[in-house]
Structures are given as C-alpha cells and as structure tokens.
Amino acid sequence: MANNNLNRPLNTNVADSSNSSSTPGTAPPPSSSDPQVLGHQAPSSSASSLTEDCSSSFARDLNSYNNGQSGATGAVSWEAPHEPSEANAVSQIHPRNGEHSLQQKPKPQKVSGSSSLATSERYKTELCRPFEESGICKYGHKCQFAHGYRELRTLSRHPKYKTEPCRTFHSVGFCPYGTRCHFIHNQPEQQPVLSESTLEEPSSFNGSNVLHLGVNGEQQPGLQSDSPSGFLSVNSQALQAPLQLNQQALSSGGVMPSSHPAAANLRMMCCRTSSSTTAHDADKDPDKDADKDPSNNSANDALAFPQEPGDFSPVAFQNPNTATTTPTAFYNNQQQMGLAASAQFQMPLARPLPSATIFGQASVGPALTPGAAMAPGAALAPAAALTPAAALAPGAAMALGAAMATGAAMATGAALTPGAALALGAAMAAGAALAPGAAMAPGAAMATGAALAFGAAMATGTTLTPGAAMALGAAMATGAALAPGAAVAPRAALAPRAAFAPGAAALAPRAALPPGAALTPGAALAPGAALAPRAALPPGATLRPGAALIPRAALAPGAALAPGAALTPGAALAPGATLAPRAALAPGAALAPRITITSRAAITPGVAIAPGVATASTGILAPGAATATVGNTSSTTITAATAAEGAAPHFTFQLPDVESESESESLEFDVVTSTLDSLLVSDDEDEDDFLRRSSSSSSLNESEFDNTNSSRRLPIFSRFSDSEK
C-alpha cells in the first residue's frame, strides 16, 4: 500500500484502512513489543488532562473531515524516541473521540537521589549548559537536562496557553518571566485557530525527515512533543510559541503577502497530501525535489491555500516568538548537515519588538545615546538628539533638530523649539517654554544651574546670540518676556539673583545687572542706549516705568526715577552723574552732566540743573526753576509764581568785586525805595530789614546769605545814607 510505503522509512506499523478498531485518518495503536515505543517517556497525568480538550477537539474535527472523503487516506505517525529512563508504554483509546494516544507506565527504578528528578515534569526540558559548552557532563545519562536537541522534550501546555496578552509586558515593556511566560508577548505567539474548513487531511511532512533525520540516518528524537494528540509538533526551549495562522486566508483560499510575519514560517510547514505521490516522495531525498515544491515557488510572492484536497495543508508547528524565522531556518540547515548538538545554533530569546506588539505597530523613534533617558510621556521628534546623561521629564518635548548637551535636563512641560539647545547642566523649569520662532543661536548657551522659571517665555523672534549666557542662579520671573527682536548680546550676563520682572526689556552688549538689581514692570531700556556697556544698576536700585538710563549713567542704592522722569540723551544723568539714595526725579525733571543730587533732595517737574551745580540736603527747587552757568560767574535765576502776585520781580544780587554800576540801575532803585519813607534806621538795621522783606517773595536758599559780610552794603542803602548825611 501507499501508506505502508510511506511509513516504511520510519519503521512504524500501519494498520489496514479496513480495520474497524481504528478510526480512519488516525494512527493505530503501536505494538507494545516495539522497542522504539518502549523507550518513550510518558508525561504526567496532570499534564495529559490539561491538553485532553485541545487534542480531542482537534481529532474530532479531523475525523469529521475524513469521514466525508471517498477513499482511505494515510495517517501521520512517527517513530518514538529513545529515553534513558527505560519506561514501558501502553496504548489507550479515548472513548470520546476514538483517538489513540500513548500512556506510559514507568518501570520501577532503584532508589537514588536522582530518581525524583528523573520523574519530574521538567525532566529533559532544558539543555544542559556544561554539555553545550564543553560537550562533557559529569552526570552522564543521569543528568536531568537534555544533552543536545535529540534528548530535548517539552511539557504539555494548558489549553489557554498563549491565548491572552501579558499585561505586564504590554504596560511596562518588560516581563520578568521572559519566554517562560504563559501569556502573549508578541503577536506571533498567539495560538492557532483552526476551523473545519482549514483542516486538511494529515499526511506526511516533507520537512519532517529533515528535522528528525541527519545525513547519516540517525534519528533526532529530541524534537518531539508530549501532546497526547499524536500529531507532529516540533519544539525546543526557544521554540515555545505556536504560530498564529491567518484563518481568513486559509478558509477563503486567499493569498498571504510575503511581508506578513507568518509567511516565512508557513512556507516551512506546508506539505503535500496527494495520496498518489506520497509513496514516491517518501522514498526520495527530501532535498532532491525541493525546487519542484510549490511552497518554494510561492515563497517570494505569497502563499496560496486552495481548498481542494491533495494540495497544501497547515501542520501544528511551533515557531519562535520572534518576528523573523531566520534562526529556525539556520537550525534546519544544521540538522540537514548533521552537526553536533553542542555546536548547534542557540535560538535567541524573545524580546519586545515595537513592530510586533499586539496593540498595534509602533512607530520607529529616534535613537538614544548611552546614558540618555526619556521619562514616560516625553516626546522626541525625528532628528532630535539626546546626548549621554541628558534627560527628558514627563511631558517635555524636543522639536526637529533640537539638541540637549550632556547633563542637561528639561522639566515637566518644558519645550524646545527647532534648533534650540541646552548646554551642560542647564535646566528649564516646569512650564518654561521657548515660543514658536524663538531660538538660541549657534554657540548660545544657558550656563550650569541657570533656569527659566515657571511661566517664563521667550517671545517670537527673540534670540540669544553666540556667547550670551545666563549666570549661575539667574532667573527670569513669572511672565517675564523678551519682546520680538530683543536680544541678550555677546558677553552680556545676568548675575546671581538678578531678575527680569514682567515687561522688562533687554540688556545691551556687555551690560550687567548686579546681584539683587531688578527691572520693575514697564521699565524700558531704550535700544542702543539703555544700560549700555559698563552701565550698572546697583543692588536695590529701581527703574520706574518709562524711566531710562543712558550710557555710563548710574543710580545709587535706593535711588529712584519717578514715572515719566526723563534723562535727556547725552545730558541727563551723564557719565559721572549720581542720584543719591532716596533721591528722586519727578516727571519731566532732568539732570545735566556732572550733576549730583544729594540724599533727600527732590526735583519737581520742569526743573533743570546746570552742570557743576549741587543742591544741598533737603533742598527743593520749585517748578520752572532752573540753574545755569555763565563763564566764571555763578548766578541763579529763579522764577517763582505765587498766589498774591501774577509775576514776581527780578532781583539781581552782585558780589562786591563789581567796580561800578550804571546810572539806569540807580534810577531803578530810587523808584523802588521812594516808598520807604519811614526808613531812618542804621545801615545794619536797613540791611537786616531788607533781607526779611525780600525773603517772603523769593525762594532763595538761606544758606547763600549766611556768609555775607555784615560790612557789605547794597548800593541802594548806601545812596540813602549819603543823602541824609
């Protein structure tokens, strides 16, 4: 018979199809006298009960399909391997589905320390590491580990094995159980779902000879399964995840593209089931007609699964849970060449691949350098770079082309726009942001420990030019901003604890804010003139809204410029001018070069002070008052408006070094003194009385008259005394 010819190379007895004791399409019970079967080791009763439902359902569907066929078909059977335990095997028939399976009866053994290990469920389920490394094991055949793949066996799996996703793996991307986990890590690990329309008649597998027989004809019983179903199942320690078959493609006869992850695996598991060619193919070399196999012809394009009998049918074959089948193909090639077990290819352990997760295909992200870290929720755009030890906090984002230097950090919610960069040790606090279009130019940096406080921002168009830096501890307060076009020029710096209040403007090249200095809201530093090179605001100094300082101007600690006060370009508070502590300039007031305002002095609006003039402490200049310098003579012109007079007369006080006076001046004073008819006092008394009367209509400083000589006479009083004499 064709079936006998088919199974002759495997030395397996096949019963006639007319035998009523065996169900068509299933393997008959093997003889107990067969030495090959006697060497087969039985699985535990608990493991058999776990897989009974799966095996019975599979055989039930298979029997229902075979009953509809007109002719008898061959059964799939394979030679049982030798095991060092020397156990006796008996045949049992499941009453529910008539399926034959092997139930093994262990032979009594001598009591020894290794007897418990030999009967363990995990006996020979893992490779012996010393044997794999050196080819020698001191335990010999008593070793509980497999010496090569020929002794390797697998445990029967639970019916729900690899049917649900692993929550730990898909939540954190790591599972401590690794490949031993009973849940799904990668998409190809899911169990195959086989329907009646996809179940073809089991037949010989052309690749089974390749997997079980070497070139020297030696059997490879290590690739076996303890499943009671009796069907071919190949496994090893790394081959633990069953293949997920495309049920729609199998049932509808569709074409599976070659890019599908299971396409390469399915190519290795397709077998010819035509009864007219099975005997002829079994006698030939498995690799002789490999080019004629239709599965090879469709490997590069697609795999077709027609529903007609006699073509291709899938076989329960376990594959590695990696996305590629290159390690499996390499392993098959070594089996064909008859390589030693110790030199065989070790299958890699399964790793979580972004493209093979069951929750969807993940996008390919940019690479991180060693030591770089990204917290959950952080985002790194394509072409962005994280150098070693740099870190992105949750919610932080780096746009295209942005870079972070070694040790730089971004807090939660911080963001860097394209081209922006953070230097070593620099940090952006929570909520800090560089607005769209803001940039840190090439070479610009935030020094170690510098920070942008919460809510601080750089507006559109702002730039930090090359060489600009924010010193250690410098900060921009909440809401502070650099307006469009504002810049911190090269070598400009903010000292520790310096701050820009909301609405404060920029610093010119080489300008500096010393520790504790502040720019209050609304203060303006004019472009090109405000806080120019070497200009400084000492600790505690304040610029009010609208106030300005020209180059080399200075404000002493505690000094203030009132709102609206102006320092005129080139003259107001020029180089060398100083405003003492608690001194103030009212709106509209101005200071000329080399003017010094002492403590507690106040200048009212409209008052101007000429160069070289100094005001005393607590001195007051009324609105409209002005000082000027004429040659070497220092004079004071005061214009005062009172409620009693619409206009005040002009008084001129001249020092005694004047040699003569004009006649017109004498006439003027005669008219003024004609009303003083009761003035008949002495010269000293006349002079004192004049000072008392003139002080009520003038705002001259009394200190200017303290040094007057008592013997000094005014011309008008000299004239009166001469006429009386």
Curated annotation (Swiss-Prot):
GO MF term (any one): RNA binding
Gene Ontology BP terms: nuclear-transcribed mRNA catabolic process, deadenylation-dependent decay; nuclear-transcribed mRNA poly(A) tail shortening
Keywords of the record: Cytoplasm, DNA-binding, Membrane, Metal-binding, Repeat, RNA-binding, Transmembrane, Transmembrane helix, Zinc, Zinc-finger
Biased composition (Basic and acidic residues): 280-294
Subcellular location: Cytoplasm; Membrane
SMART domains the record matches: ZnF_C3H1
Region feature (Necessary for cytoplasmic localization): 193-711
Knockout consequences: Mice are viable and fertile, without apparent morphological or histological abnormalities in the placenta, but display a decrease in the numbers of surviving offspring. Display an abnormal accumulation of placental 3'UTR ARE-containing mRNAs. Exhibit also a decrease in ARE-containing mRNA decay in differentiated trophoblast stem cells.
Source organism, top-level taxon: Eukaryota
Domain notes: Contains long series of C-terminal alanine-rich repeats that serve to maintain the protein in the cytoplasm.
Membrane topology: Multi-pass membrane protein
Biased composition annotated in UniProt, kind: Polar residues: 42-72, 100-119
GO cellular component, one term: cytoplasm
Protein name: mRNA decay activator protein ZFP36L3
Tissue specificity comment: Expressed in placenta and extraembryonic tissues (at protein level). Not detected in embryos and fetus.
Annotated transmembrane regions: 380-400, 420-440, 441-461, 468-488
